[in-house]
């Protein structure tokens, strides 16, 4: 069971209490601080769409501290980030690994950040399947297509040649915040809020 802090705000009508994430949402901040799965993807997509409806011209800030997770769930978030009108700024706090790293690089170019002691990890898709040989073949073909798609997007968003991205994602590839900047996964390492 996770504990969610509550903040109390004074208004002219008295006190109002919010869970911390609702309060951050008022400031157009979304937190991805767990595994990427269907539930977290639905929550983040809903928050992105809500904030776009509130003000389509104001940036949204997605803070990421995630070990990664489901490719299809992550692609739902990625596609929504690209679909909506506001720029989505991404900020790595802690670790952005696997699909977490993919979502970090998916932020608006020029607005992708990491705190100084953050880490980023990229790698190829993971998967497992059991069943009949024909079905295993179908799933193996699907994961290879996903690998190609993810690497192509990473190449486009980092400016690295596809061949380099394919080589670097063959195994777990850990990068410090500065290395992530050099690689093109982020645009700037920040230590103070602007």
Curated annotation (Swiss-Prot):
Active site: 98 (nucleophile), 123
InterPro entries: ClpP (IPR001907), ClpP/crotonase-like_dom_sf (IPR029045), ClpP/TepA (IPR023562), ClpP_His_AS (IPR033135), ClpP_Ser_AS (IPR018215)
Keyword line: Cytoplasm, Hydrolase, Protease, Serine protease
Subcellular location: Cytoplasm
Keyword Methyltransferase: no
Entry GO terms, CC: cytoplasm; endopeptidase Clp complex
GO molecular function list: ATP-dependent peptidase activity; ATPase binding; serine-type endopeptidase activity
Keyword Lipid metabolism: no
Domain of life: Bacteria
Pfam families per record: CLP_protease
Cross-referenced NCBIfam families: clpP (TIGR00493), PRK00277.1 (NF001368), PRK12553.1 (NF009205)
Subunit structure: Fourteen ClpP subunits assemble into 2 heptameric rings which stack back to back to give a disk-like structure with a central cavity, resembling the structure of eukaryotic proteasomes.
Family: Belongs to the peptidase S14 family.
Name the UniProt record assigns to this protein: ATP-dependent Clp protease proteolytic subunit
